[in-house]
Design a protein with these regions (language model features):
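Binding-site signature for planar aromatic cofactors or substrates
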Residues: 1-176
Length: 176
């Protein structure tokens, strides 16, 4: 802290954000901001996070980046999402690598974030209409790779959801 600086007193009425019970839907091209620690915070952009359930998010991370090393060391993370359709949230939870190599993208790992809390940052004074935007500047291979990784994550999410659904038309145990 700077010499002579004093910590700002916290006002009880503004320290807590309302929480959501479940993750909302957001547009495909949403860019999130992943926060990891070492112990200081580090924030990186994450392209196209995939909603994998009410309280799970899947992302792909380049395997040679510091963010992945920090996540492995300290799996408590936060993912800020500002997306079109007035999505403004911070999902806090525990991350873990679920695939060391992604199909057709061996330099990327797949990460699942199990969400403990979803801070709702929407405000009545404004709405998020587009969220963070970025454009691919090199050849189309980067965009094709991103689409492929997201399609893989979505497929894994759908398969997991199907496995967690109770079987239809099956008699309940104990009933004839």
């Amino acid at each position: 802290m700077a010499v002579g600086a004093r910590p700002t007193p916290r006002r009880p009425d503004v320290t807590n954000h309302p929480e959501l019970d479940t993750l909302p839907e957001w547009p495909l091209e949403t860019i999130g901001v992943l926060v990891t620690t070492d112990p200081t915070p580090h924030a990186i952009p994450v392209s196209w996070p995939v909603r994998a359930g009410d309280r799970q998010i899947l992302i792909s991370l380049k395997s040679n980046r510091g963010s992945l090393a920090r996540l492995r060391e300290r799996p408590e993370v936060a993912l800020l999402i500002l997306g079109g359709g007035d999505v403004a949230l911070c999902a806090r939870g525990t991350a873990r690598v679920i695939a060391e190599q992604m199909p057709s993208a061996e330099d990327y790992v797949a990460v699942r974030i199990d969400i403990d809390a979803i801070d709702d940052h929407r405000q009545s004074a404004f709405a998020v209409t587009k969220g963070i935007q970025r454009t691919v500047l090199d050849d189309e291979s980067e965009l094709r790779g991103l689409r492929s990784r997201v399609n893989t994550l979505r497929s894994w999410s759908q398969n997991q959801a199907a496995q967690n659904q109770p079987a239809q038309n099956q008699p309940a145990q104990g009933r004839a």
